[in-house]
Amino acid sequence: MKGLVIKNTGSWYQVKTDNGQLVECKIKGNFRLKGIRSTNPVAVGDRVQIILNQEGTAFISEIEDRKNYIIRRSSNLSKQSHILAANLDQCMLVVTVNYPETSTTFIDRFLASAEAYRVPVKILFNKVDAYDEDELHYLDSLITLYTQIGYPCFKISALTGEGVDTIREELKGRVTLFSGHSGVGKSTLINALVPGLEVKTAEISAYHNKGMHTTTFSEMFPVPGDGYIIDTPGIKGFGTFDMEEEEIGHYFPEIFKTSANCKYGNCTHRQEPGCAVRKAVEEHYISESRYTSYLSMLEDKEEGKYRAAY
């Protein structure tokens, strides 16, 4: 029997079979995927084969080939990854310039990870109703930056409804992963997009000005127009999983394009003579914040660490 994994609760997986039945499944035996070192071999969005036993228990016996997936640092094993979701049509990264602030380093690491696994990303700048003039000016500068690179950007307010109808249209016929720091209003936005869903939300910690986690495990919800939303736990950071040092620049589109003009084919864009990327940064053709994010990922790779980006 075939089905779609719609929820992961750690040891159990909820599968929606092709005939619409919801089945609670476990993994059969020491199930592992070849070539993927992760804490969860099965992810929300996976198409799977399940076996129903006479006792009423069910097991996932096989996973169909994935078209893509996206991973983050495992929360408890720093050198292992955790697959957030599989078979995605797009990611929507929810960010805020304050309450709490999403750093450009975090944004860039997420984008690089999505580029590595061939998942298109749209950036949703939430809480636009809450910003002062300086914050709105900064927000506009970020939108200009990321739009020029090629990432669609949207101004929204989950609280007032600004931009929500536009995002709802973007969900039709697509499997969409929603991600972002805790506290950026991701769950509030999902509730606004799909009235009646009632995804749990939380307050911002007044002491740290950071969000408190409300989503514990990834879960998939149907949305009008034959689409699906995948809600994920709030994420603290992304590491350089499965990336070789020389590949990291490939996942920054503007750096990759400019690197064709570097003097050396293996240029890492740090100290090498004739580096077209460093020249482009100096001449403001490439954003200094993006270049700094790139260097931080190189540093992680050199030190063998998987550092959270705040």
From Swiss-Prot:
Cofactor: Zn(2+)
Its biological purpose: One of several proteins that assist in the late maturation steps of the functional core of the 30S ribosomal subunit. Helps release RbfA from mature subunits. May play a role in the assembly of ribosomal proteins into the subunit. Circularly permuted GTPase that catalyzes slow GTP hydrolysis, GTPase activity is stimulated by the 30S ribosomal subunit.
One GO MF term attached to the UniProt entry: metal ion binding
Gene3D superfamilies for this protein: Nucleic acid-binding proteins, P-loop containing nucleotide triphosphate hydrolases, Probable gtpase engc, domain 3
UniProt: GTP binding residues: N126, K127, V128, D129, G180, H181, S182, G183, V184, G185, K186, S187, T188
Enzyme Commission code(s) on record: 3.6.1.-
Name of the protein in its database record: Small ribosomal subunit biogenesis GTPase RsgA
Cofactor note as given: Binds 1 zinc ion per subunit.
Main EC class the enzyme belongs to: hydrolase
Family, per entry: Belongs to the TRAFAC class YlqF/YawG GTPase family. RsgA subfamily.
Signal peptide, first to last residue: none
InterPro entries listed in its UniProt record: G_CP_dom, NA-bd_OB-fold, P-loop_NTPase, Ribosome_biogen_GTPase_RsgA, RsgA_GTPase_dom, RsgA_N
Subunit-level organization: Monomer. Associates with 30S ribosomal subunit, binds 16S rRNA.
Annotated keywords: Cytoplasm, GTP-binding, Hydrolase, Metal-binding, Nucleotide-binding, Ribosome biogenesis, RNA-binding, rRNA-binding, Zinc
GO annotation terms (biological process): ribosomal small subunit biogenesis
Domain CP-type G per the UniProt entry, residue ranges: 77-238
Binding annotation for Zn(2+): C262, C267, H269, C275
Compartment list: Cytoplasm
One GO cellular component, as annotated: cytoplasm
Organism: Bacteroides fragilis (strain YCH46)
Pfam families recorded: RsgA_GTPase (PF03193), RsgA_N (PF16745)
